[in-house]
Regions:
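Bacterial carbohydrate/catabolite-sensing allosteric modules
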Residues: 1-153
Length: 153
């Protein structure tokens, strides 16, 4: 089954949209997500072992966090699967670990500073409002940061 929390759901929907707009076929089994958003690398390792066993010829995976991606790469290395030559990996968030990991992890940049600024602005406007403020959805653009883990040979 797919993700149940809104953060993972939106990340997966973005991935699905990108795949549907490309020449590739969508296989949602190839998405590693974390419902709790706290256990990272360890959960990535557990899910990756199952995924690589089910799909031994797998050549690419999207993980909904960079920490899940690190777990996937760790498992791939233990199974002598070369990243990115045999398996391409992309994470989400652009945490510092994605730049420092070997190989560096391609990721979708989540602009945390901009998100915090927008949240603070919304909070201050709600605090200073004289009437009830309605719920507001704010969409902040992300971008893909290509690194070594998805490098095309």
């Amino acid at each position: 089954s797919g993700p149940r929390n809104v953060i993972n759901l939106q990340r997966v929907q973005g991935y699905q949209k990108a795949i549907n707009e490309s020449e590739f076929n969508l296989n949602t089994d190839l998405i590693i997500f974390n419902e709790k958003l706290i256990e990272g690398e360890q959960l990535g390792m557990v899910r990756s072992k199952k995924l690589l066993k089910k799909y031994p010829l797998l050549n690419g995976v999207f993980a909904t966090t960079d920490m899940l991606a690190t777990g996937l790469i760790k498992v791939a290395k233990k199974q002598n699967i070369r990243v990115p030559e045999e398996l391409k990996v992309i994470g989400f968030s652009n945490w510092a670990i994605s730049m420092l990991y070997e190989p560096s992890i391609s990721t979708v940049d989540q602009p945390g500073f901009e998100m915090g600024m927008k949240a603070a602005q919304l909070l201050f406007s709600k605090i200073s409002a004289t009437s009830t403020v309605s719920e507001k959805t704010v969409i902040i653009k992300t971008k893909v940061i290509p690194r070594e883990s998805s490098k095309v040979n």
